[in-house]
Each structure stands twice: as C-alpha cells, then as structure tokens.
Amino acid sequence: MSEYRRYYIKGGTWFFTVNLRNRRSQLLTTQYQMLRHAIIKVKRDRPFEINAWVVLPEHMHCIWTLPEGDDDFSSRWREIKKQFTHACGLKNIWQPRFWEHAIRNTKDYRHHVDYIYINPVKHGWVKQVSDWPFSTFHRDVARGLYPIDWAGDVTDFSAGERIIS
C-alpha cells in the first residue's frame, strides 16, 4: 500500500472535501453556527481567503487561497475540526483525512466553484442552487458573479473532485 503524500504550494489555491465519519449525519447543517464560528476563529488566527464554500449535512466542499509564503492548510483543517467537535461536545466525528486538489488555472477554478455551488442540487437537497442557505453562492450573487437563477432545476451536472486531464 502506498503512503499518501500531500502536495503543498505556498500561497496556493485549493479545493477541499471534508466528510463526517457518519455519512447519514446532518450535524454540519443542524450545528451550522458552531461550524461557522470555528471557521471564523481559525481564519482570524491563521488567515486564508474563502473563495467558495458549501456545507451539506455530512460533508463540505470549499476553495481556499492561502497567504503568500504559507502552505499549511492541514493545521487549519485540524483546528477547524477540533473547534467544531469541542463546541458540539462530541468525539471522533470526522473522517481522519480530507481530500485536496491544487487549483491549476482559471478553468479549473471555475469548474470547482461551479461544482461546489451545484452540490446541494446534485445530492437532492434542493431543486435550485439559490435555495440552499449554507453556501457562499449568495455572497457571489451579491457580488454580481452569478445570477440568482444560475443552474436552476439542473438535475444532471457532470463534475467532481477529481479531474483527469
């Protein structure tokens, strides 16, 4: 069995998928404010830019850009997981790792942001992207980056974490 090695780029932009251990849980959305508080605290102590984020009941996808000269996303994730777990008064709720993908170019970035925003529709939680409250989609609509009806009623969106090129 090969040993997994993470790829680090100082100041890089990354797509992440982070899962709860119990894939039937709804903890991330029922305790969304606790999760949000954990993210804000870690971001205040160890800054990073949130490019896009969606929180689903048992997993989340996001894109971060780290500060110039900084490649340590792992300790930020460790701290977010720790803060949230402690706030919920639970133990052992996360899958041990997370999945990351270094964003390579503008096309790759756009593809992953679209994937993040369509994810609640893909999983059947809502019919339209704008109906999902746990997403930076609404921020990006306010900024004029997406129309409010973007991807409305899309039922088959072909995208994912892994892109082979």
Curated annotation (Swiss-Prot):
Keyword Ribosomal protein applies: no
Protein origin, superkingdom: Bacteria
One annotated GO biological process: DNA transposition
Keywords, ordered alphabetically: DNA-binding, Manganese, Transposable element, Transposition
Description of activity control: Cleavage occurs in the presence of magnesium, but is much more pronounced with manganese.
A single GO molecular function term of this UniProt record: transposase activity
UniProt keyword annotation of Manganese present: yes
Record text on subunit structure and interactions: Monomer.
Function: Transposase that is always flanked by repeated extragenic palindrome (REP) sequences, which are clustered in structures called bacterial interspersed mosaic elements (BIMEs). RayT catalyzes cleavage and recombination of BIMEs. Binds REP sequences and cleaves BIMEs both upstream and downstream of the REP sequence. Could be important in the creation of BIME variability and amplification.
Family: Belongs to the transposase 17 family. RAYT subfamily.
Protein name: REP-associated tyrosine transposase
Annotated source species: Escherichia coli (strain K12)
Gene that specifies this protein: rayT
